[in-house]
């Protein structure tokens, strides 16, 4: 593979990728038709068979002409926009950027997993047979042919063949592929009899369909954007919970427990590195001071003692590590927390409330999940700090006699600023760190620019390391509300000084709580304005989308609905009214109210007839498939859905309801 890019271009320009399947399908259809014609009873005249053969040949000629036209226009085929479907301009974009597929049940599912042992009905997916008509091939196994799921994936075998031949004879290879595809489509045109033609074409088709090795099917289901969609999950399709806790864990508490586990592991590893470096250095300094005191006792000269004391400024204590180990340790702790949270498979491993908030604003993260994420992250950080303090308590007591009121001990679990920094500089430090973290995270998880997610943990390691190595001096780079507030609450629970935790340094505790949030929003905004191209971000929304959201929020406020409920007569929108006030409402007010969804006709003797009714799509009651047509009795929905609601509404007659927007129902005889 001397030039992979050139090989890929040659492959995309080849018409056989698109015409091969169509010619194979035509051959299958021709062979089945001719097989039926050859199996007719013997008392039929031969003229009928000849006519059928002539018709088949004519059809083949027309299909060949069409195939030739498709091949001629293949260079103008737009591979990027082949699955493009325009959406309404006022519709809010969704965070899923891959199409949804359906298997046997027919219901669309979000593409999220890799199921290596799935049983797929190839009739439902491919709408054709890729192998011999056996029961096992239809249910348990299938060849690696193009399916609905893999139709947009390149044929890797052909790709490598093109790559090997790209530097020698690319044109001859292209012509050979075209001639092979056209020869397959013309297989029935040169045959003499219909029976022989049907047997030959059927044999060739079966041989072509059995070229690929048969194996267990694998369904690739990418993630949504806020879950780093390029990393799949591997879960057997036969898996199911076998106890109550497994059911609860995989339904209600799945994402909460993932964030709890990941944040707890991150805090334990990260704070343990800081404790090891600082406590080991403190104990080493204490031992050095004891050695100096022994020199004074033995009567050493003053010059010798001064020279030994100067070593404290020249040589750093490295018994448990240095400052570089802290930055490296925190970077590794974040990556290990990411994996312990399930990576991108369960919750996306945010481990940071500011990351969750930025995904909510810029990546379509569900609002209802935010409290679970915040709770899991905060409780996980609290638990991790508490476990670590219990583990290191004896060592802390040995190194620091006043551990409960020593800021150096508290700084091993939460962050503290330099004493000479003002509140404004403290806030700006955390704001900048949070912005850089969020911009880097969006850059690493951008599906439109990040070509591979295999190196995502390594890139995240580098990002956390460079932030801690370059921005940790002033305030300690909390960058995370849970990382600072959780351990701070844990230290307060075990008896640390109240003023040291909540009062000192101009009440610094609020800075790691507010600064990372605003910084993450600003960092995500700058990245989306400059780089991001997806429609999930509000930066890339159109103006009608904003207008629709504002109008919807305005007319759905509680005061508006309460004030206009008596005047509303239509379910099409929340802001429609009756006629003008200058009309006479005497007759309307005389009508009785009804709670049914349909208006009964004034003619009691009129027989109920079936009608084709277009169900109105109402705000808050939208259906998944658009506007369905239903066949119901007259006294169910009818056209009175515009004149009556489930609550108290004025019952209108059939004539008045049929004059409304969607009241033109057609009677079925």
UniProtKB/Swiss-Prot annotation:
Listed InterPro entries: Aquaporin-like, MIP, MIP/Aquaporin, MIP_CS
Protein topology in the membrane: Multi-pass membrane protein
Biased composition (Acidic residues): 72-81
One Pfam match: MIP
Keyword check for Cell inner membrane: no
Record topology, Cytoplasmic segments: 276-325, 391-446, 528-669
Superkingdom of this protein's organism: Eukaryota
Compositional bias per record (Polar residues), positions renumbered to this chain: 1-16, 87-99, 133-147, 638-655
Family membership noted in the UniProt record: Belongs to the MIP/aquaporin (TC 1.A.8) family.
NCBIfam families reported for this sequence: MIP
Name assigned to this protein: Glycerol uptake/efflux facilitator protein
Recorded name of the encoding gene: FPS1
